[in-house]
């Protein structure tokens, strides 16, 4: 077992690929407290509940620790330059983190001389705008749940509540929560980028159901960790019945009240407009007036008062907001709108209107959809820029700084902050936290979260109250600057200064965050005047950067370095290393356990291989996965105050109820697939819930018919089957169909059936087709016998159940209907791994008894899957994994369909890649043109002097090696000619006997 934050014990070191052994699961089995340990009662300790509205400490100075008023702690008043790490190794558990001296006491920075010309940062208490309670208050960061990005999150809650609680605690818990808002982009069951979110009302007559939309439940659970959390909603596309603004108001109101009545919280902010569209300012003012005056349909005066107090946000446009000038000139609009938010771009309009709105009119300005990190930062240093570079955590940090400096953004919401959908979906690897394997409990916490801690942990973030008594810190414009170029992305590789200062409104404390996303060290002179403290308090220095070679990847994350003292003139000298972030603060945090506890380290990614129930991992039978959609007796935990588990709730009730509940492990890419209990029946089915003849269709980002995926991307050879039936008694000219697919990995066409390599489609009249990449390669009708297959007595009625099956073994694909083989297809360019898909037209369609089984004599799955940049694992000390020789480029920020957005590309002949593993084969995956010729060496012997490669798409195989004994092997491939692109390396498990 891998302890949270710890190194691996027997069974293998933790790594991104992960072994299949179930003992490789991360976690201690209990819930995680704020110090990283398991609480004996299974509860989550969060360090106390934040004061209402504050999102953090409510003390006057907002400090977690006390204020220092004297000189330096330790030996004298020396200044800090190029501060070394103290000897004695890292503290905390396993993989590092925490301060090098254990975090117990302060140490003085060693004396040093400044190098180069320092940049002066003046912090004048007169510039801390305590009277500005909205525009300059630092509100921290937010989670956007939208577009199917939370599709698997409730499975973590049901299957691994300890890991779900850990996730909530990391994001929303502690004395200084990172995330202060959950923003929910309401769905309409159609693809809005990654996938759809379920509509809360599919018909105007339907009672709003928020339990089937995971964002609402996420917000409810997050509030048990931070009751001050804000929640907002907006839409991109609406259900088919929503045609007018009155319909919008009805949909929103019913949904808002459903959330309040189901979970006990009122929505705080609403954007009445359309996501990433120009605002309708007339409707905005009308909506604001309606919501304030509405007195109908409430269950209590409290409910009405809370509803009437909802605030309005506009406009969530992509790029600079178009409405700044109107907000300045139109007092009616200005009084109607509390928040101006727009996406990604860090800049203001040409007149500086958003800066004026914040400073002169005290309006909140948000980056209401911001870019997080692209990649797994643990493996990023191979590219040569540490934790910085293209789409890195440091780049994200500079985006925060530039967003405030240029347009006074004081809140940043990440889309998505949580990536809880299968890899290969649109906008994959764009998140701060990845939770894609609910059966294993695997979660990757990226170093981007540590960057956010450098801001949120050294201030009191949140929303100030009207009485201005909560002590929320202000951002100090005159003490913040960046020379980083660009708007999205932002680049600080030019080595120019970049910093942001946060300060307590009572002027007793401040923190300055320095971001250095460059190869050049930077030196700063801090000078503080007109502050409310006495003397010249030392500044604690906290740093994050990549590890030195041979050290645990996170050994330099959130490290307390030392206390720097002011010189006789009151000046502090601070040096910021290349590719690092450093926070200098008057707060005393060094002795606080929370600050010396690293993020949890991901454990092994156990392959999905269950018993016949689908609920329990088991490698002792022929079943890889099964689901009859009953879930009888299954419950999920209920979280109470402080994240404590206070009870349980029926599985289906918690996820939407009998007429539409979130199934286990499915990830929709179009349409709405839910567990459904037909009237008069006791048999639950999986039903595609969007029927265009009954409800029409709303708008969409990526058009396509309903399709959902389930399973593990590492599955290789298997037979998948499912029962299907229809509710519409017309074939609808071939559009009313049911289908099963195999070996789906995602990609640009994944929102349609053409993105599934192999798919069997059936009409109820017996017409079938085997599709490869969306094109028919075989077909016929089992009633007439066309196509070569006849099934005697086949019942060609719409409501009869039939069984669809696909067997995929190496390059062969065999289609089955009711157990009869229809055809076998051999693919010259086989796709060898991937999940199972279920698909239909936009008509009510039923599925049941899904089963995925192993195939005798064939390997069922990869035993390990590594990112191309995974040259070491995550243990302490790290163990060597992939070994590159010769000349390669290792690039980050690649295509969204590349695994973790990284690629390694050979530059010249002679480039080599070597890996030692246990298994029967090795594959290289990634987008290739098939030009590479490889010399293959196994255990020191050349086994193929000139192996060919295949042209391949993202997620699929360009080179395969099979037939090895199930033992330890060292395989090397050397490029003889052409170009080899490596996205992933996978090892093959033993065949099923």
Residue map of PLM features:
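Aromatic/acidic polysaccharide-binding cleft in carbohydrate-active enzymes
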Residues: 367-484
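Extracellular glycan-recognition surfaces and repeat-rich motifs
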Residues: 635-694, 875-898
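N-terminal catalytic cores of secreted or lumenal carbohydrate-active enzymes
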Residues: 113-272, 281-289
């Amino acid at each position: 077992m891998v302890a949270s934050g710890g190194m691996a014990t027997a069974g293998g070191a933790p790594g991104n690929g992960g072994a299949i052994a179930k003992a490789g699961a991360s976690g201690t089995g209990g819930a995680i407290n704020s110090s990283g340990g398991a609480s004996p009662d299974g509860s989550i300790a969060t360090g106390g509940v934040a004061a209402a509205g504050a999102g953090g400490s409510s003390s006057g100075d907002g400090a977690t620790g006390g204020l220092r008023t004297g000189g330096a702690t330790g030996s004298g008043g020396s200044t800090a330059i190029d501060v070394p790490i103290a000897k004695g190794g890292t503290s905390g558990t396993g993989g590092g983190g925490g301060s090098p001296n254990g975090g117990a006491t302060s140490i003085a920075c060693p004396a040093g001389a400044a190098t180069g010309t320092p940049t002066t940062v003046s912090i004048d208490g007169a510039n801390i705008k305590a009277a500005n309670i909205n525009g300059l208050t630092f509100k921290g960061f937010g989670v956007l749940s939208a577009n199917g990005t939370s599709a698997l999150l409730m499975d973590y809650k049901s299957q691994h509540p300890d890991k779900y609680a850990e996730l909530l605690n990391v994001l929303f818990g502690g004395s200084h929560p990172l995330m202060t808002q959950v923003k929910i982009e309401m769905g309409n069951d159609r693809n809005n980028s990654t996938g759809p979110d379920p509509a809360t009302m599919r018909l105007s007559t339907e009672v709003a159901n928020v339990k089937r939309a995971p964002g609402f439940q996420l917000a409810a659970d997050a509030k048990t960790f931070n009751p001050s959390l804000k929640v907002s909603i907006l839409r991109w596309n609406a259900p088919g019945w929503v045609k007018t603004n009155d319909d919008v108001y009805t949909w929103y109101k019913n949904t808002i009240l459903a959330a309040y009545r189901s979970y006990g919280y009122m929505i705080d902010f609403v954007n009445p407009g359309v996501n990433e569209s120009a605002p309708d300012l007339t409707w905005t003012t009308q909506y604001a007036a309606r919501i304030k005056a509405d007195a109908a349909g409430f269950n209590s005066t409290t409910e009405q008062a809370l509803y009437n107090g909802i605030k309005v946000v506009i406009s969530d446009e992509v790029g600079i907001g178009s409405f700044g000038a109107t907000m300045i000139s139109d007092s009616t609009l200005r009084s109607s709108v509390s928040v101006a938010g727009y996406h990604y771009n860090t800049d203001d309009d040409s007149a500086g209107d958003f800066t004026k709105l914040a400073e002169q009119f005290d309006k909140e300005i948000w980056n209401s959809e911001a870019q997080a990190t692209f990649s797994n930062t643990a493996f990023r240093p191979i590219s040569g820029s540490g934790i910085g570079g293209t789409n890195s955590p440091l780049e994200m940090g500079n985006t925060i700084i530039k967003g405030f400096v240029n347009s006074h953004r004081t809140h940043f919401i990440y889309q998505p902050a949580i990536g809880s959908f299968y890899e290969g979906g649109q906008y994959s690897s764009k998140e701060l936290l990845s939770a894609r394997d609910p059966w294993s409990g695997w979660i990757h916490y990226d170093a981007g979260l540590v960057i956010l801690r450098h801001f949120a942990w050294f201030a009191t973030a949140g929303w100030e109250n009207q009485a201005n008594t909560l002590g929320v810190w202000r951002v100090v414009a005159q003490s913040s600057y960046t020379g980083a170029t660009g708007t999205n992305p932002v680049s600080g590789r030019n080595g120019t200064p970049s910093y942001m200062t946060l300060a307590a409104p009572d002027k007793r404390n401040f923190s300055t965050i320095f971001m250095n996303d460059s190869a050049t060290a930077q030196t700063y002179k801090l000078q503080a005047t007109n502050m409310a403290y006495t003397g010249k308090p030392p500044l604690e220095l906290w740093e994050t950067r990549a590890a030195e070679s041979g050290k645990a990847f996170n050994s330099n994350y959130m490290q307390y370095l030392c206390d720097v003292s002011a010189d006789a003139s009151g000046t502090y000298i601070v040096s910021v290393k290349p590719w690092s972030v450093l926070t200098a603060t008057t707060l005393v945090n060094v002795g606080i356990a929370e600050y010396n506890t690293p993020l949890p380290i991901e454990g092994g990614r156990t392959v999905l291989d269950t018993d016949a129930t689908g609920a329990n991992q088991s490698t002792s039978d022929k079943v890889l996965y099964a689901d009859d959609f009953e879930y009888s007796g299954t419950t999920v935990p209920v979280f109470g105050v402080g994240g404590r588990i206070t009870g349980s709730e029926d599985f289906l009730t918690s996820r939407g109820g009998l007429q539409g509940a979130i199934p286990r492990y499915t990830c929709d890419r179009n349409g709405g697939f839910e567990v459904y209990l037909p009237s008069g029946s006791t048999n639950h089915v999986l039903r595609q819930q969007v029927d265009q003849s009954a409800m029409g269709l709303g708008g969409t980002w990526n058009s396509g018919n309903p399709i959902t995926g389930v399973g593990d991307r590492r599955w290789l050879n298997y037979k998948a089957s499912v029962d299907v039936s229809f509710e519409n008694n017309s074939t609808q000219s071939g559009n009313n169909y049911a289908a099963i697919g195999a070996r789906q990995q995602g990609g640009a066409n994944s929102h349609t059936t053409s993105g599934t390599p192999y798919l069997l489609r059936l009409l109820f009249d017996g017409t079938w087709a085997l599709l490869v990449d969306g094109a028919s390669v075989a077909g016929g009708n089992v009633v007439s016998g066309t196509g070569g297959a006849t099934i005697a007595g086949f019942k060609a009625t719409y409501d009869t159940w039939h069984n669809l099956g696909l067997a995929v073994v190496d390059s062969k694909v065999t289609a089955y209907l009711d157990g009869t083989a229809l055809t076998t297809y051999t693919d010259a360019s086989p796709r060898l791994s991937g999940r199972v898909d279920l698909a239909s037209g936009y008509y009510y369609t039923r599925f049941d008894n899904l089963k995925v089984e192993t195939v005798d004599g064939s390997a069922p799955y990869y035993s390990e899957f590594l990112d191309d940049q995974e040259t070491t694992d995550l243990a302490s000390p790290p163990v060597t994994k992939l070994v590159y020789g010769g000349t390669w480029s290792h690039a980050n920020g690649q295509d969204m369909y590349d695994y973790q957005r990284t690629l390694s590309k050979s530059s010249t002949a002679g480039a080599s890649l070597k890996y030692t593993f246990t298994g029967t084969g090795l594959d290289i995956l990634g987008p290739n043109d098939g030009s590479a010729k490889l010399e293959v060496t196994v255990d020191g012997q050349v086994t193929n002097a000139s192996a060919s490669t295949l042209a391949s798409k993202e997620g699929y195989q360009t080179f395969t090696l099979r037939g090895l004994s199930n033992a330890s092997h060292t395989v090397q491939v050397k490029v003889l000619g052409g170009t080899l692109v490596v996205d992933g390396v996978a090892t093959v498990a033993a065949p099923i006997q």
